[in-house]
Amino acid sequence: EIEALGQEITWENIGDPVRKGEVPPKWIREIVADLVDQADSWAYCDSQGVAEVREFLANEVNRRDGVRVSADDIIFFNGLGDAVAKVYGFLNREARILGPSPAYSTHSSAEAAHSGYGHVTYDLDPYNGWMPDVADIRKKIQYNDSIAGILLLTPDNPTGAVYPREIVEKIAAIAHEYDVFLIADEIYANIVYTGAGRLHMSEWIGGVPGIAMRGISKEFPWPGARCGWLEILNKDKDSNFAHYVDSLLAAKRLEVSSTTLPQMSIPRIMGDPRYPEHLDARSKQFSRRADEMSGVFAGCEHIIANKPEGAFYYTIIFEDGLLDDSRSLSIENPKIREAVERMTEGVEPDKRFVYYLMGATGIVVVPLSGFQCAHHGFRATLLETDDKKRAWIQKSLRDAIDEYVASSR
């Protein structure tokens, strides 16, 4: 509606690097083009995934220190959205998964839909770099015996936080103590630009049963491929967990197969000697953009703007209690101003800011209240490839924050 009224829109709400202008390297596109000419890339594959690809991915896991897997521990899906729906949908009805807050909506909505209740969460602490509150995790599990598993996203969406080994090992120890399994959404595992480096679930989970969620959408990047997989860890450690995993595979077999061509590309692309260089170059690129973002918001009063260390996003929160319905941004176009005033009636305080931001600047970000979070703020991305436009986006956000905070004084 705002766009129809004449405001040019800048989309900062979706993590699609290709849509934001990133072009996958030519050598990756050439591999995919070559595979299109192979007849078997047009056929169904095994329901669990192409056998050779699963063998390749199992070997990749086994190159690390930690849990060993086989090709039978890899299950392909049509993107992680498909995998997430199955992972939550085939739990026992009364079983709950404890997830982080801010909560990525794909997980939180699927878990809530499965259980019929609101998603149960533990806190990520914005005053400590968005690290998980381990004491809160323990408390939530200790007093809720319906919790069957703990979810982590690392690197995290929406905060960009990357959890150090000491934190995830503490969470694994709690899972072991209370006999629950772990889920790690690792779709951004190779997009890390902190000095700590990349850390994979198989390296820190120990003997706890777990599921690592992986895919190619963010790191090739090829979001349109809809190709993701689960790495099943320590299936043999718990019979209930083994039965649950078998139910996931049985459900997958009813769908015949997942997309064949993207699977077939994985060994050729990930096994190419240019791939590590590709990952490192992208990490350095996002590191530079994170530095830019951190510099723009440094010294900005009334907010917390933690510098991201992985993934594509950063999250900014306002001081608790700061936002209210007396604040606004100046909007020159009267029709847009009228539309925004109508849209903001009775909405969450951060959603009000987001609507005014869209009306005033055309920039679309995601309110943090949409991530089942008690803090008010928003998520934006580091994906804009045009340096001047990215600088404009970040400066516009900073200016909008300053104006909005001052508007009711």
Model-identified regions with their sequence ranges:
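N-terminal small-domain helix-loop-helix segment of the aminotransferase-like
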Residues: 1-79, 86, 133-136, 269-272, ...
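Helix C-cap/helix->beta junction micro-motif
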Residues: 5, 177-178, 208, 361
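PLP-dependent enzyme catalytic core of the Aspartate aminotransferase-like
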Residues: 59, 63, 67-68, 328-409
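Conserved core segment of the aminotransferase class I/II
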Residues: 206-287, 291-296, 300, 304, ...
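Conserved glycine-rich beta-strand-loop-beta hairpin in the small C-terminal domain of fold type I
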Residues: 267, 283-294, 304-321, 327-341, ...
